[in-house]
UniProtKB/Swiss-Prot annotation:
This is Speckle targeted PIP5K1A-regulated poly(A) polymerase. The gene is tut1. The zinc-finger domain is required for terminal uridylyltransferase activity. Together with the RRM domain, binds the 5'-area of U6 snRNA. The RRM domain is required for terminal uridylyltransferase activity. Together with the zinc-finger domain, binds the 5'-area of U6 snRNA. InterPro entries: MTPAP-like_central (IPR054708), NT_sf (IPR043519), Nucleotide-bd_a/b_plait_sf (IPR012677), PAP_assoc (IPR002058), RBD_domain_sf (IPR035979), RRM_dom (IPR000504), Star-PAP_RRM (IPR034388), Znf_C2H2_type (IPR013087). The lineage of its organism: Eukaryota, Metazoa, Chordata, Craniata, Vertebrata. Residues 134-146 have a biased composition (Basic residues). It is an enzyme of class 2 (transferase).
């Protein structure tokens, strides 16, 4: 009865929302997944959903009161069509096919006007009968980014070919800067467009100034970058705009969708865009005339007026879209002839000062822009930055630039001085205060002393990636103003600016507006990807190929700048990373637990990294008393010192050393504890049921397993002394990084829950149960292959914040099994390690 009442009280889902099989909901309108009901309620009332809902309703209403008109002379004007249809019913808007003049969309004030036009038997223009039919109703879709612009930096493939011909890494970086910088022709186009816009705005707003900022002027201009413009309307108008805007900004919450608007492709969607722009008001009835007075208007109204001037009075400008809800209200536009895109803001004097500061830093040391260009391109290729709509969860170019600045400030000696140091050096400068923030710094680079740092570009780039891979960024605020970090949470009392500072997974304080987190929009996933890609790039920079010139394969910065392979290009090639918390346990014991899971539980084989599969230096060195005792047992029989994880896996090794291996196992078996014997007895019935085809492979696995059972037996007998005097350590000379080859022999991750339920009826528990499950699954699965199913590269890195970071990358995966194996490991491995260490619940 209670179930019936609860089911009847469930609120029905809106038509735009559907339930997801695995739980949660999906908003079809916004294209996002929502985990639960409270989040769904928040989403439905959120700005993005409401905006799209209103936009869809508006589009549907347009379609219902519009007709499609064709068969008119090519020279027909909009006014002529308006005169014809105005006689039938009041016309709201007309959009014509200006390119070819083949059709027009006529929108009436009401649906009755559309019906009246369709009922007219004959509608003529200049004696020619017009074809009038209902407008085709298209399903509403969220706007997506338009087609790529012709003005773009080189693609990674073309760039890599150019970089291969360079002599060293420094030349590669300089070549990258040269290829990404805009050409003289593009720079000239920007100047012409700026002049055209200035001339137009001056006509309508006498005394105004149009000032460029951002990448166009800060020394880090890239081909195809947007033209950022600040429209200064004069003292009176600026005070009117900025005073009201600041109040709105204080009450406006930043979000990743603040500027999430689209710039539609002009050739395919321009007609629909123009219809939308004109839907709210008839622009013909609201003339935009020169000499406008903006006094008394709100910031949104002024933004709307400026948008109309752009839309109707600047030749070649289209796709004009106002975003009054952004942190800094902005107008996006495109210029068809030049292919440039631009943004106009009305209250962004702080951005002008920011751009001047970036320009100063760019001029102080030639290495600064070269590193910024390289890091920006790296982030773009790896999809870490470059939000296509101005907002979004990724890093922006300004944030990347500040990351480079902060890194250069922390070198010894610093490559760049901090802003605080610059102010101390030039105390005689006139103070610059904008919106209450101190924006003072030297105006002339000659006033600043040269840096004493003589590091090469290749060294600095390598250190950049290692630096950020080693930081726990979610627990720090990076402050480029003074070159320091602030640990989180704030100490008491917190700094004055902390009240408005929006904390997130990545925190970079704006050097001037101290309460602004430049990375406030960055999502947790984007922050994690940034750190993992930094770690991957750092590993590449530590390989010999980084500084070793080659004409046959990528070297230097080329491997860093190549995009990762897509899923279509190589199924299962994508790797994964798994974090194992140390939890107060030593790194050596944590690694031993990880090894036990892979080898004992999952029946895999671990081999030390070799030169062909590990170019990054030394592997983990195991030299405990435990290992020495084990080596004494096996020294003569096996013919070499077999460490804990050094297990032979090749067929010839199996054949030549089988007798000695069995002898070794026999010797150590006498020292087994009762616990180890129980492990052995659990698997013997399974072994007796093997078929001949499986026996060879599983006998080898059994040999490995018996070898480690004997090892664990010795551990139990020696646990006190062995751990007390342990010398096991990770080789920190390679930044605490080690690498092995992991061979996967059996698909023991498939059907594991079912088999575990079956085995739980017995006496086995914990790790013993998991081993029994794997043995049973290995017998059941028919993996008909002579070699391993997969070969993976396992990299372990000890992080600063008490965790062991594991990276698994497929090396050989013909069946594409690695993706499902990785998915299984992401939750299974940390839980099993915690259980082995005695601080976790059974799996």
């Amino acid at each position: 009865m209670e179930a019936e009442e609860s089911s009847s009280s469930v609120v029905p889902l809106p038509q735009d929302v559907q339930s997801v099989v695995r739980g949660g909901f999906r908003c079809l309108l916004c294209g996002v997944n929502i985990p639960n009901r409270p989040s769904l309620t928040d989403h439905l009332s959120g700005r993005r959903h409401v905006r799209l809902h209103e936009e869809r309703d508006k589009r549907n209403q347009q379609q219902e009161r519009s007709v499609y008109v064709s068969n008119f002379p090519r020279e027909t004007s909009e006014e002529q069509l308006r005169d014809v249809f105005q006689k039938i019913s009041p016309v709201r808007n007309i959009v014509m096919d200006k390119d070819r003049g083949l059709y027009a969309i006529v929108e009436f004030e009401s649906k009755d006007g559309m019906c009246a036009a369709l009922e007219e038997p004959q509608i003529k223009l200049s004696g020619k009968r017009l074809r009038v039919k209902p407008r085709e109703k298209k399903e509403f879709q969220r706007k997506k980014g338009g087609s790529p612009r012709t003005l773009q930096p080189p693609d990674p493939e073309a760039l890599s070919k150019e970089l291969l011909n360079c002599a060293d890494v420094e030349q590669q970086i300089k070549k990258l800067v040269s290829l990404c910088s805009p050409s003289h022709h593009e720079s000239h186009l920007r100047e012409l467009l700026l002049s055209l816009l200035q001339e137009t705005f001056t006509e309508f707003f006498p005394g105004c100034q149009l000032l460029p900022f951002g990448s166009s002027v800060n020394g880090f201009e890239i081909s195809g970058c947007d033209l950022d413009l600040y429209l200064d309307l004069g003292d009176d108008e600026a005070e009117n705009v900025e005073g009201k805007a600041e109040k709105e900004i204080q009450n406006r919450e930043e979000s990743s969708t603040d500027m999430e608007v689209s710039m539609e492709d002009p050739e395919t969607e321009r007609k629909e865009e123009e219809m939308e722009i004109g839907n709210s008001k008839n622009d013909e009835d609201e003339d935009v005339t020169p000499g406008l007075s903006l006094k008394g208007l709100s910031s949104e109204e002024i933004l709307e007026v400026v948008g109309k001037v752009l839309r109707h009075c600047v030749p070649g400008v289209h796709g004009v879209q106002s975003v009054p809800t952004a942190r800094r209200p902005v107008i996006h536009f495109q210029h068809k002839t030049s292919g440039l895109r631009g943004d106009v803001t009305l209250n962004n004097r702080l951005a002008l000062r920011n751009s001047s500061f970036l320009r100063l830093c760019s001029d102080l040391d030639a290495r600064v822009p070269q590193l910024v260009y390289t890091v920006r391109y790296w982030a773009r290729v790896n999809q870490l930055a470059g939000n296509p709509f101005g907002g979004g969860p990724l890093l922006n170019n300004y944030a990347l630039t500040l990351l480079v600045f902060f890194f250069l400030q922390t070198r010894n000696p610093p490559v760049l001085p901090t802003l605080v140091h610059l102010r101390e050096e030039t105390a005689n400068e006139v103070p610059q205060v904008i919106d209450g923030w101190d924006c003072s710094f030297p105006s002339d680079p000659a006033q600043v002393k040269e840096s004493g740092n003589q590091q090469s570009l290749s060294s600095l780039l390598s250190e950049f990636f290692s630096f950020y891979a080693s930081l726990d960024l979610h627990l720090l605020i990076l402050c480029p103003c003074n070159g320091l970090t602030i640990p989180l949470p704030f100490s008491s009392p917190p700094p004055a600016w902390s009240e408005g500072f929006r904390l997130g997974p990545l925190n970079i304080q704006d050097p001037f507006e101290l309460s602004h987190n430049v990375c406030g929009n960055v999502s947790s996933r984007a922050a994690r990807r940034f750190i993992s890609h930094c770690a991957a790039a750092a590993r590449i920079c530590r390989t010999p190929n980084y500084n070793l010139h080659s004409t046959s394969h990528p070297w230097g910065i080329t491997p860093i700048l190549l995009p990762p392979p897509t899923e279509r290009e190589c199924v299962g090639r994508g790797g994964t990373e798994i974090s194992i918390p140390l939890g107060g346990v030593s790194p050596e014991k944590t690694y031993a637990a990880v090894s036990k899971v892979f080898v004992d539980v999952l029946l895999c084989t671990l081999e030390e990294g070799r030169e062909d599969s590990c170019q990054e230096g030394k592997a983990l060195e195991l030299s405990t008393k435990h290992a020495k005792a084990q080596c004494k047992v096996e020294k003569n029989e096996v013919g070499g010192e077999l460490g804990e994880q050094e297990v032979p896996c090749k067929a010839e090794q199996n054949n030549t050393k089988e007798a000695s291996k069995q002898k070794s196992i026999f010797k150590t078996e006498e020292g087994m504890t009762e616990s180890a014997r129980r492990k052995r007895e659990m698997t013997e019935p399974c072994m007796s049921d093997m078929t001949n085809g499986k026996k060879r492979r599983l006998e080898f696995t059994r040999g490995i397993w018996d070898h480690h059972l004997a090892t664990s037996a010795m551990e139990e007998e020696m646990c006190g002394e062995a751990h007390k005097d342990s010398k096991t350590k990770i080789d920190y000379s390679n930044n605490g990084t080690a690498q092995w080859e992991l061979l996967v022999w059996h698909r023991v991750w498939e059907g594991r829950r079912k088999e575990r339920r079956r085995k739980q009826k017995g006496e086995a528990d914990g790790v013993e149960l998991e081993i029994a499950v794997s043995q049973a699954l290995a017998l059941e699965k028919e993996d008909k292959c002579d070699g391993p199913l997969m070969k993976l590269i396992l990299t372990a890195q000890l992080t600063v914040k008490e965790s062991l970071q594991l990276y698994l990358t497929p090396k050989f995966d013909p069946q594409g099994l690695s993706s499902t194996f990785f998915h299984f490991l992401e939750s299974y491995l940390p839980r099993m390690v915690a259980q082995i260490q005695g601080c976790g619940d059974p799996v």
